[in-house]
From Swiss-Prot:
Protein known as: Fusicoccadiene 8-ol C-16-hydroxylase
Annotated localization: Membrane
Chain's role: Cytochrome P450 monooxygenase; part of the 2 gene clusters that mediate the biosynthesis of fusicoccins, diterpene glucosides that display phytohormone-like activity and function as potent activators of plasma membrane H(+)-ATPases in plants by modifying 14-3-3 proteins and cause the plant disease constriction canker.
Record key words, sorted: Glycoprotein, Heme, Iron, Membrane, Metal-binding, Monooxygenase, NAD, Oxidoreductase, Transmembrane, Transmembrane helix
Gene: PaP450-1
Protein family (similarity comment): Belongs to the cytochrome P450 family.
Topology within the bilayer: Single-pass membrane protein
Cofactor(s), by name: heme
CDD domains: CYP60B-like (cd11058)
GO cellular component: membrane
Source organism per UniProt: Phomopsis amygdali
Any GO molecular function: monooxygenase activity
């Protein structure tokens, strides 16, 4: 018996099951009958849906936990609480290379899944690539409603990517090296001024990459490296991503979810809106400069967009601001995450740190000699960064696609149509079936020295795979090499005791990084 507002509910379904009914002076028999009818109908529909999901659904033969097969609530709970990546890894260890992680979704972590899900059109009768799951990427849509490079259709993606391709070419990145060096040099001097006092490396790295990205994207640095504490603008980026993911998972179960998402972000997505507005303001200033300066020779990203606007590839003003905001989000957060992870694992493996530091200092007599071209010749540095990308991928989560109506072959299995499918980075990279001792930081696995001959190195795709793979990988590699090279040339680095378990982190698509306290001691003679 349950009491609500002074009334009792009672209805006998059988001699074994009793449910109370509302009764009172204002409720007649028809109201009681209607209430009972709707209750029975609702329960019948609910249990029918649960039974269908578990035993009649087209994915019924794919393994996975019962709760995940019954309801999407299982997936949404783990994702909205930052636990999905580790849970998915756990499920793959238990159930194998394909797991049903929601009633309508499969996770893969082996074989040809990368190419089958994210590759070109080689195995699909429709001749089309698998499309992004629209609602999952709703959080990536810019607050102005414009779909950016991350959330656009194939057609729009190709057009936008074409505009930005020149900006991310090796030639363009090489032309920007002086800009990168200016910000990296300033970070080194700021850290040197601390005289070896433990400091949060996450903040320094994030501020450095954020200043680089704002300078490259908007023609003006945000100057966050000058801050002694976290710059609110830089910190807003992660908070905005977290808010968007949480909103998406809450609204999966709501009617009119697309309309409700817009209202929810306006009401509670303060960080995301503030970050976006700041990007818009600076983008407008940069575009105005280009309009008044006929000889606009700044080699930043905006210059390439402005040049494209004089051709048939033109982007609308709202598309420009939406994509610039995305560049600020992704361009700074992901590179800083990787570098922080790399520093952590280096300091936890002193013999690797000592070897890499010695090699860099032997190769360069002065910091002026350090450049991305020379650093690219250091195969051990490349191996260290590749291992960091494997064990601590900047984008930790999955990016789901939807199978076409006729279904698709994925890793040798037929998957029915209209099913979400994905590769989870953590589950792929930490699988003992793919990598020997997957939780150990071992750069040697990338050097072909035979230490782990069974490793499936091709399964590590930190920049994703296929036509929608990360367009900024050339810039990312330049930043990673330059920042790591300059830090290790200038400083002896040591992990502070309070950060011993720094890698025990939750994820909201990207890592929720706590402070990484490191002592940067100037090397002797510096």
């Amino acid at each position: 018996m349950i009491g609500v507002c002074g009334f009792q509910w009672s209805l006998s379904f059988s001699t074994m099951y009793t449910v109370s009914l509302p009764h009172g002076p204002f409720l007649g028999s028809r109201a009681q009958e209607a209430f009972v009818g709707f209750s029975v109908l609702g329960l019948t529909l609910l249990f029918s849906k649960l039974f269908y999901n578990a035993y009649l659904h087209p994915l019924r033969k794919f393994p996975g936990p019962l709760l995940a097969r019954l309801s999407r609530l299982y997936y949404s709970y783990y994702r909205s609480t930052g636990q999905l990546e580790w849970k998915t890894l756990e499920l793959h260890k238990k159930y194998g290379s394909v797991v049903r992680i929601a009633p309508n979704e499969l996770s893969f972590n082996a074989g040809t899944a990368w190419d089958d899900i994210y590759g070109h059109t080689t195995k699909r009768r429709s001749g089309r690539r698998l499309q992004k799951e629209a609602f999952f990427y709703l959080g990536a849509v810019a607050p102005n409603g414009e779909k950016n490079l991350g959330a656009s259709s194939d057609e729009d993606h190709s057009r936008i990517r074409g505009v930005l391709s020149s900006a991310f070419s090796e030639k363009a990145v090489f032309a920007q090296e002086d800009l990168l060096m200016r910000h990296i040099g300033f970070m080194v001097e700021r850290i040197r001024s601390l005289n070896g006092i433990p400091t949060d490396a996450v903040r320094w790295l994030h501020h450095c990459t954020f200043d680089i990205t704002t300078d490259l994207s908007l023609g003006a640095s945000a100057k966050t490296l000058a801050c002694d504490e976290w710059s609110p603008l830089a910190h807003l980026m992660f908070e905005g991503i977290k808010e968007g993911i949480t909103a998406v998972e809450i609204l999966r179960f709501a009617p009119f979810k697309y309309q409700a998402f817009s209202l929810l972000i306006k009401a509670f997505g303060k960080a995301r809106l503030e970050a976006f507005q700041a990007a818009i303001n600076q983008a407008h200033i940069r575009m105005a400069q280009a309009t008044t300066d006929k000889e606009d020779k700044k080699p930043d990203f905006m210059s390439y967009i402005i040049k494209a606007n004089k051709t048939s590839k033109a982007l609308t003003p709202s598309e420009i601001t939406a994509n610039v905001a995305l560049l600020l989000d992704v361009g700074s957060e992901t590179t800083a995450s990787l570098l922080a992870g790399c520093l952590f694992y280096l300091t936890k493996t002193p013999h690797i740190l000592e070897k890499l530091t010695s090699m860099i200092r032997k190769d360069f007599q002065t910091p002026q000699e350090i450049n991305s071209k020379n650093l690219a010749q250091n195969s051990y540095l490349t191996a260290v960064l590749n291992e960091a990308l494997r064990i601590y991928p900047p984008v930790a989560g999955a990016t789901p696609r939807v199978t076409p109506p006729e279904g698709s072959q994925i890793d040798g299995r037929y998957v029915p149509g209209n099913i979400s499918v994905a590769v989870n980075q953590v589950a792929m990279n930490r699988s003992p079936k793919n990598f020997t001792n997957p939780d150990q930081f071992v750069p040697g696995r990338w050097l072909g020295d035979g230490c782990f001959p069974d490793d499936q190195l091709q399964l590590c795709q930190p920049f994703s795979h296929g036509p929608r793979a990360c367009q900024g990988r050339n810039l990312a590699w330049a930043e990673m090499r330059l920042i790591m090279g300059h830090l290790l040339w200038n400083f002896d680095v040591e992990l502070s005791s309070e950060s011993e378990n720094w890698n025990s982190q939750k994820t909201w698509f990207i890592w929720d990084k706590p402070d990484l306290m490191i002592r940067f001691k100037s090397r002797e003679g510096q």
